């Protein structure tokens, strides 16, 4: 427990390029608290934009991976090259989300939940933010799947083996996702959102652009190449797979994958990461709040949240 006379000054002009653990936690809580003040329309617009970015880069990743899924090339380099290229392309989505200040449900499971733990967000506001965020992400991802991926014919089954590698790559990914058991899917979703929430935490911890890119890229690359399950990415992938008539059903997509993935992602952010961080740093946040009151809110004027929304 920190001493009672601890003072916390969050200085955006500091020469430090990395925040300490206490400051990172405070920034994360303040970031989550800020979301509760947005209007429903603002939240929805940000969430739709984030869902669209996930769809944009999932489409690009599918095309990139599909290029190496060409049957003759696959015989030489193996299917693992497609997975490597897929994982290497997908992190661009999270860089787009960070740079535009859009709103991703999976990151909110950590930041907004910690603000709830600190009683800086009311339960009804918490439910409002999380619901609108998830709904907006869904609308953005599915809209992109239909208006770009489906209407462009990028993943259409052309019934010619030498031209069908994009469809086959998508089909194989979708089939693998819907054939996990419930427990397997939840576990893979927990692993995924640990990386995603850490990517958010990295951005709040680091104070330079190169650090953002480097840390976010490898955090997201790790979950993408490991085959973890991300609810918004899966919403795009499984819906475009349904649109182009792959070998999966609506029941498999929504009940066997999306439902347990949603549960696992939430557990990772709210419980696996959120609770330990809260118990470790709650006294530091209490002292920060007390310092803010003692100094007539002077400390808050210097608070800089790098992940702007």
Swiss-Prot record:
Predominant place of localization: membrane
Stretches within the membrane that do not traverse it: 20-35, 164-179
InterPro entries: Aquaporin-like, For/NO2_transpt, For/NO2_transpt_CS
Outcome after substituting residue 90 to A: Moderately decreases lactate transport
Impact after mutating residue 196 to L: Appers in parasites grown in the presence of BH267.meta inhibitor; increases resistance to BH296 and moderately to MMV007839 and BH267.meta
Pfam families: Form_Nir_trans
Cytoplasmic topological domain: 1-19, 36-40, 101-122, 207-209, 281-309
Extracellular side: 69-79, 151-163, 180-181, 227-249
This protein's UniProt keywords: Cell membrane, Membrane, Transmembrane, Transmembrane helix, Transport, Vacuole
GO-annotated biological processes: lactate transmembrane transport; nitrite transport
Misc. remarks from the entry: The expression levels parallel that of the L-lactate dehydrogenase and the glycolytic enzymes. In contrast to human monocarboxylate transporters, is not sensitive to p-chloromercuribenzene sulfonate (pCMBS). BH267.meta inhibitor attacks parasites at the trophozoite stage. Inhibition of the protein leads to a build-up of lactate and swelling of the parasite and infected erythrocyte.
Protein name: Formate-nitrite transporter
Species per Swiss-Prot/TrEMBL record: Plasmodium falciparum (isolate 3D7)
